[in-house]
């Protein structure tokens, strides 16, 4: 009976985890999931657009969910598209997290002016950005370890605002709603050198692949650089111009909310990338899927379940609940192990390279040790400890990502 109960619990947990691995339906009529799988170069490696959107949001607000001013939520990729192509709308999203009350006072704001008391929009910050710059300039010469909480907060907020501002130059010059037509006219494109140079200088996303198939990652260019070089190269730069124009055409479709045109362009561009950069495109698609599956969050939930079951086993049904706690730990550990291995493959890096991966690895090792101890002493103490440690380290890793 005990063995049968254990198998039933294991089957339920595996089915639950399996349900999180199923592809989710695309929200709305725009193929945002398909666009999110397109690779771009950032921070020295190729990443899907989905990763750019999620990591950007994590950096500036500490979470991936975006709340629309009128209610509801906005997908991370949709938020990024608004930053690229509808900045006047993106500026109204409350995505800048500010916790320090003295930093809020710079902008004449209080906790009641922001979403959940700590998130504010660019529109709310814009009138006092000069004062933020002044305060950050005063704080920057101070050694990082010696800065006050206020100084750390203003320096960090300025970095977030600068990151957001640079994102706006990634796909087209901010405010140029006629950019698609302009990129199709060599004379107009050549005349707008200043805007293209601003894109080249400010954008950190290299979104245009090399003209030749394959190509090294360092041959990817940002849109401004690609358009400038294509304009100088003439007919020889046609391939680069075509790929750079994809982002201009995408912008027109997104501003017009023309889903059929948007989806057709995304499908054609992905087909082009798959034909010429197949390995990079497939790996990028896997990373976007990995982001949506989010195995570490599911592991976190399993570790919480393991802790609760272990604690409950000390009050009632020690055998059944203790065994259930161990099974939850087993499944959470296997899922976290798979997540670490896949992450290593996606990033082409060893398991420990920064604070984020250190937290993951420490938690993984600690949970593994607790699993071994629990098998020697079936009293659920190691299961409870493993659940608590696993959950805590994954929370820490989430905030370090």
Question: Model-predicted segments: where are they?
Answer:
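Hydrophobic alpha-helical transmembrane signal-anchor segments
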Residues: 1-24
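Soluble extramembrane regions of membrane proteins in the secretory/endomembrane system
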Residues: 3, 21-292
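Amphipathic, alpha-helical segments enriched in basic
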Residues: 10, 31, 237, 244, ...
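Core alpha-helical transmembrane segments of integral membrane proteins
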Residues: 280-400
């Amino acid at each position: 009976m005990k063995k049968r109960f254990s198998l039933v619990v294991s089957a339920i947990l595996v089915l639950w985890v399996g349900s999180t691995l199923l592809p989710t339906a695309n929200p709305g009529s725009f193929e945002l999931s398909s666009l999110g799988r397109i690779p771009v170069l950032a921070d020295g490696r190729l990443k899907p657009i989905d990763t750019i959107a999620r990591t950007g949001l994590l950096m500036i607000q500490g979470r991936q969910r975006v709340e629309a001013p009128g209610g509801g939520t906005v997908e991370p990729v949709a938020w990024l598209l608004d930053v690229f192509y509808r900045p006047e709308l993106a500026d109204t999203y409350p995505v800048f997290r500010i916790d320090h009350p003295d930093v809020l006072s710079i902008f004449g704001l209080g906790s009641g002016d922001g979403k959940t008391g700590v998130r504010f929009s660019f529109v709310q910050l814009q009138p006092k950005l000069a004062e933020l710059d002044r305060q950050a300039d005063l704080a920057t010469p101070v050694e990082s370890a010696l800065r006050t909480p206020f100084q750390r907060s203003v320096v960090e907020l300025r970095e977030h605002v600068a990151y957001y501002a640079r994102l706006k130059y990634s796909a087209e010059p901010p405010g140029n709603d006629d950019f698609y037509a302009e990129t199709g006219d060599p004379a107009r494109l050549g005349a707008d050198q200043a805007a293209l140079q601003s894109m080249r200088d400010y954008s950190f996303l290299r979104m245009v692949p090399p003209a030749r198939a394959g190509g090294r990652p360092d041959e990817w260019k940002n849109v401004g650089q690609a358009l400038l070089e294509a304009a100088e190269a003439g007919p020889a730069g046609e391939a680069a111009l075509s790929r750079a124009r994809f982002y201009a055409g995408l912008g027109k479709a997104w501003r017009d909310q023309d889903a059929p045109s948007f989806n057709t362009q995304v499908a054609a561009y992905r087909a082009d990338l798959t034909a010429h950069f197949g390995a990079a495109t497939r790996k990028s698609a896997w990373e976007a899927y990995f982001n949506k599956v989010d195995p570490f969050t599911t592991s976190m939930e399993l570790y919480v379940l393991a802790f609760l079951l272990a604690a409950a086993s000390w009050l009632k049904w020690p055998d059944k609940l203790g065994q259930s706690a161990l099974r939850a730990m087993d499944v959470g550990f296997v899922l976290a192990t798979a997540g670490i291995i896949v992450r290593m493959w996606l990033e082409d890096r060893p398991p420990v390279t920064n604070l984020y991966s250190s937290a993951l690895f420490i938690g993984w090792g600690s949970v593994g040790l607790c699993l071994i101890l629990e098998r020697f002493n079936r009293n659920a103490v190691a299961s409870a400890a493993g659940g608590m440690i696993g959950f805590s380290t994954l929370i820490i890793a989430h905030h370090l990502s």
